[in-house]
C-alpha cells in the first residue's frame, strides 16, 4: 500500500483527496493544510475545505503557518516515511528539505497544460487569453514554480460561455482522476518524467484588483474573456455606481454556433436588423428578453447578467427594465 501525505487547502483540492481516500491501494496518513481563517459576521475560525474532509475521515491534520520553518511539522513529515507527498493547491512553497523526504518524490497536479501558465492563477489567465483548451498536468516537484518534470497530462476544452468557476470544477474532478492514475503508474514504474521546455513557458501571476476593471475600448471578445476569466469580479461604472458584469455574449455571426438554445433569439434579432455603431461604452440596442448591447472598441457585447452594488445578480433584461435603460430615449454610457 502506498503511503501518502496530502498537502492542500481549497475546494479545488477536495476531489483529489477524496479520490485517494477511496482507493484501497493508497493510505493517506496525514493532511497538511493552511491554518484556519476568521470569516463571516461572527469572525469565526473556519477550517479549510481540505481540513474538513480530513477531520471527517479521522486523518491527522497539521496546520503550520510556515511549513518549511516549523521544526515540529518537519519532524512529523520526516518520521512519517511516506512514499509520496501529494500537493494540490496547498498555498505554501515547499523547501528542498521537504521535497527530498518522500521515497518517490512530491507529486503535484497543476491546472494548466505545462509549461504554459505556470503560477498561481492558471485557470483564470488561460480563459483571459482566449485559449480554446486547458487541462491538468501532474509533475514531480522541484524548487521552481511549476517547473518540475512532467508525468501525465489531460486536455479539457474551454467553451465560449465557460468561466473560471465552471472550468475549475471540471479540472478539479479531472485532476483527481489524473493524479490517482499518476500515483499508481509511478509506483509501477510505468511513467518516465519529461523535462519541461522552458522556452515555451508562460506565466499566470496573482490577479490584481486593477485586472477586474473593464476597459470598453478593448475588443468585445477580449472583454468577454476578461469577464469570464476573472469571474465573478469584473466591474464598470453606471450612473456613478459600481456595476459588476457577471456574464456577457459577444455579438456576431462567428459566435452563433456556440450559443445555447436560450440565446438563439440573439442571432435572429441581430441578423434581422442592420448593425449599429455607437460611441465606445454606449448602449446601442436593448434586445427584449435579453438585455443591453454595448459598443466596444471592436464589436458589440450583450450584457447577459449584471449586479449593481448592494443588489442581487439579475439578467441584462431585468437590469434594463429596472433602470429604464432605453436606447433612443436615453443613451446611457458605461464609463471606464
UniProtKB/Swiss-Prot annotation:
Residues bound to (6S)-5,6,7,8-tetrahydrofolate: 112-115
First-level EC class: transferase
Gene3D superfamilies cross-referenced by the UniProt entry: 3.40.50.12230
Keywords: Protein biosynthesis, Transferase
InterPro entries reported for this sequence: Fmt (IPR005794), Formyl_trans_C (IPR005793), Formyl_transf_N (IPR002376), Formyl_transf_N_sf (IPR036477), Formyl_transferase-like_C_sf (IPR011034), GART_AS (IPR001555), Met-tRNA-FMT_C (IPR044135), Met-tRNA-FMT_N (IPR041711)
Pfam hit, one: Formyl_trans_C
Catalytic reactions on record: L-methionyl-tRNA(fMet) + (6R)-10-formyltetrahydrofolate = N-formyl-L-methionyl-tRNA(fMet) + (6S)-5,6,7,8-tetrahydrofolate + H(+)
GO cellular component terms, A-Z: cytosol
GO-annotated molecular function: methionyl-tRNA formyltransferase activity
Enzyme Commission number(s) from the entry: 2.1.2.9
Superkingdom field: Bacteria
Its job: Attaches a formyl group to the free amino group of methionyl-tRNA(fMet). The formyl group appears to play a dual role in the initiator identity of N-formylmethionyl-tRNA by promoting its recognition by IF2 and preventing the misappropriation of this tRNA by the elongation apparatus.
Name assigned to this protein: Methionyl-tRNA formyltransferase
Organism: Trichodesmium erythraeum (strain IMS101)
Organism lineage: Bacteria, Bacillati, Cyanobacteriota, Cyanophyceae, Oscillatoriophycideae
Gene that this polypeptide is encoded by: fmt
